[in-house]
């Protein structure tokens, strides 16, 4: 009788545990997202977007510049386990300039509360490619009458400060095509409002280098629906 009672208590405990566990031990998900992207840049050529004079010489002081906040559209695909492995790949494209960005990260996913909430942290590799050419942007005149391109990367105040030097009287051009390789830190929060769909917010900050800069720090905030497949 004692053995039967112990077996019965174990069965009851197992049923209780199963009743509060999620239906999905692991699942594949797809999440289209909208977001915003920016970056801090530093280096002698500032990622190929140096100010260039008509004679071909460049002026790019070794100063940090913060790129505009670029709107993004993209999609995430991955695998997420309850209190376990997270694997995700995403591809983003800029909506206001020619830029593509992709990440592949691996990490850990933690389920919280009694609902469908998840917090995840992951890292991996990030690659991006950007083309910026100010000839497609409006031009303005500074105090000396020098033509200055409205920024795609530099704040206008930075360009104006550079061309206010009386020795700099030539036209300037923002140009460049560059790729960046970085190590991202990804933090995501998702909540499933129903059995197969919910909402997710992801924050990413990366540290990387490119062909023409010393340091590059891209960052992005993205949000969108998430669907279990």
Swiss-Prot record:
Cited InterPro entries: DUF2715
Pfam families the record matches: DUF2715 (PF10895)
Highest taxon of the lineage: Bacteria
Family, similarity comment: To T.pallidum TP_0315, TP_0618 and TP_0619.
Name this protein carries in UniProt: Uncharacterized protein TP_0127
Source species of the chain: Treponema pallidum (strain Nichols)
